[in-house]
Amino acid sequence: MKIIDAHVHIYPDKIAQKASQSISDFYNLDAAYDGKVSTLNEACELAGVSQCLVHSVATNPSQVGSINSFIRKTAMQHPRKFFGFATVHPLAKDIEFQIENAVAAGLSGFKLHPDFQKFFADGHEAMQTFEIIDGRLPVLIHAGDNRKPYSGPERILKLCKAFP
């Protein structure tokens, strides 16, 4: 049986510990791993996971380019194992450019995180982002954190109805 992990955050080694700790702190949970690609490979081997959707989240628009370069490079180094999902930032002035670059780079989809990126999943910026993506690639969107107002089920439902 093929096992695919559809939600894996990865980071460059130099920031992996800090980034993983930030997520652990945000959710008040212990991280399952340290965010490094080498550790992910080891964990996949032990668990029998054959493929992963890998991504990271730009918490501000200036991070998009470097994150997507890292994700693309990592996916290219592991072409049958990792499928890279681009980050875009819906509040960015150059959102269309970000999306077009990700598509042209051959990334496999998009990852959005309303709570970290501070946009409403049913707001104007999200709707505009989905209009530009126009169904060309799948979108993985964080949902349901009841501590923040951005990604509740009712907001995701509105987004899904607008873009079935």
Regions found by a protein language model. Give the residues of each.
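Active-site gating/metal-coordination segments in enzymes
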Residues: 50-51, 61-148
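Acidic, amphipathic alpha-helical patches
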Residues: 40, 95, 99, 156
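An N-terminally biased module of ancient metal coordination in phosphate/nucleic-acid-related enzymes
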Residues: 1-57, 61-62
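Short, surface-exposed alpha-helical segments at coil->helix boundaries
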Residues: 34-38, 65-69, 150-154
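N-terminal cationic-hydrophobic initiation segments that often serve targeting/anchoring roles
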Residues: 44, 75-79, 160-161
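Hydrophobic packing residues within well-ordered alpha-helices of enzyme cores
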Residues: 71, 156-159
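Histidine/acidic-residue-rich catalytic or RNA/ligand-binding cores of hydrolases
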Residues: 15-17, 150-157
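A generic "structured core" feature
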Residues: 2-11, 45, 98, 102-103, ...
